[in-house]
Amino acid sequence: VVAGIYHEWDKQFRKWVYDEISHWYRGEIVLAKIWTVDVGKLVELFSALGWEIRNKSYFQKLNTCRLVVNVFKHGDGTSLAELQQHYPEYLYNPFDSFGGQLSDVTHLDHTNLRVSDEHINEFSEAMIEFWLDLPERIVNSPSASLPKWFESAILIDQKNENNNK
């Protein structure tokens, strides 16, 4: 359930980003990148353009949802390590009551992932808050310090445009 709602949110978010950027930029590479970069890079872009999404109350839950989905999909890895460190409440620890080394969450793996109905509701509420908070428009500012991935894609678009002349 969580993976389904997260992936649907992700697709709708990327579509919105694509549509917004299309108002002020038309390069193929940049627009294609919107569908391939990780969400963190899109958040980085919005910070550069003035929308500080990381400071919003819902961001932590959206990010946690992303981690949960990644652990569910990929198993052990960096997302699991982040859950262990920052959000261990999503990992069931059968030895928690013993204390000591047995209760250390670093011994847990993807099979210990547990998501409750309450967690699902929190994720859903964060997504609703996100959509309600969305700026009406995202515009490019000449003074914005755009992320490297975005600038690199612009350079490729410009090179392709020059080659087609």
Feature-to-residue mapping (PLM):
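A generic signature of intrinsically disordered, low-complexity regions enriched in glycine/proline
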Residues: 14, 42, 123, 133, ...
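Short catalytic/metal-binding and nucleic-acid-binding patches
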Residues: 164-165
